[in-house]
Amino acid sequence: MLRLFYFSAIIASVILNFVGIIMNLFITVVNCKTWVKSHRISSSDRILFSLGITRFLMLGLFLVNTIYFVSSNXERSVYLSAFFVLCFMFLDSSSLWFVTLLNILYCVKITNFQHSVFLLLKRNISPKIPRLLLACVLISAFTTCLYITLSQASPFPELVTTRNNTSFNINEGILSLVVSLVLSSSLQFIINVTSASLLIHSLRRHIQKMQKNATGFWNPQTEAHVGAMKLMVYFLILYIPYSVATLVQYLPFYAGMDMGTKSICLIFATLYSPGHSVLIIITHPKLKTTAKKILCFKK
């Protein structure tokens, strides 16, 4: 039964990966076409372009790894498996930092706080986006190198077999590996939660101001608040189980876990990127309009 459930999870992950690849290819092509036509690109579209390329490569690598894992009859090469893990970890970390940067940009541009820090960020964040994107890549490279260093210093735990189940002896090296992975993702989580909280607070202030002035509170600024807030909240809903599942998959003793746990981790790890990419298309006016035109043309 568990074997069938695991096989179903693999099929579901392959389908979701195909969806994610198509969605991110669409995001990349639309933004690239706009960039070539107008010879300029907005800060948010520049981030989306980088995010689309990164996720396209990441999901493609994940799909190749899944197909190779299922179709391979012989034992997998340790070096090839390590290559897949490290490339995926780097691309995954880069894409998460790109999303974090996108949420920061939305928060700074849409909120109407008059604090000097926010006013300074409003003026300076857009010209700094290329450098911030490079910083995201460098942070991801550093995180991946840190993972390599700690995993080399952390030997695989020895299996301790009992009559009922199999347990693992977790040593201090593995605990340091877990701590490094948690710390690398906790900063992203804190920034994203803070951005969403500031957006919600700004939206509440905006609605109160509109009500006090006896005017309709649903205007373009309110719509921008709500759209960005929805994207951030849905991102967090997808991101939290995804980060837990991915953390478990990176641990050395993941290979010894039962198929039920592996299946759940696989589904949560695969659902995030395609789901968030679809949300980006739905909430982005230009991408949404282009997608509607393509669907209407096909009909």
Curated annotation (Swiss-Prot):
InterPro entries tied to this protein: TAS2R (IPR007960), TAS2R4 (IPR030055)
All ranges on the Cytoplasmic side of the membrane: 31-46, 103-131, 194-230, 284-299
GO biological process: detection of chemical stimulus involved in sensory perception of bitter taste
Membrane topology: Multi-pass membrane protein
Domain of life (superkingdom): Eukaryota
Ranges of the Extracellular topological domain: 1-9, 68-81, 153-172, 252-262
Any Pfam family hit: TAS2R
Sorted UniProt keywords: Cell membrane, Cell projection, Cilium, G-protein coupled receptor, Glycoprotein, Membrane, Receptor, Sensory transduction, Taste, Transducer, Transmembrane, Transmembrane helix
Protein location: Membrane; Cell projection, Cilium membrane
Residues linked to a glycan: 164-165
A cellular component term, taken from the record's GO annotations: membrane
One example GO MF annotation: G protein-coupled receptor activity
CDD domains noted in UniProt: 7tm_TAS2R4
Additional remark text: Several bitter taste receptors are expressed in a single taste receptor cell.
Stated role: Gustducin-coupled receptor implicated in the perception of bitter compounds in the oral cavity and the gastrointestinal tract. Signals through PLCB2 and the calcium-regulated cation channel TRPM5. In airway epithelial cells, binding of denatonium increases the intracellular calcium ion concentration and stimulates ciliary beat frequency.
Protein name: Taste receptor type 2 member 4
Organism field: Pan troglodytes (Chimpanzee)
Organism phylogeny: Eukaryota, Metazoa, Chordata, Craniata, Vertebrata
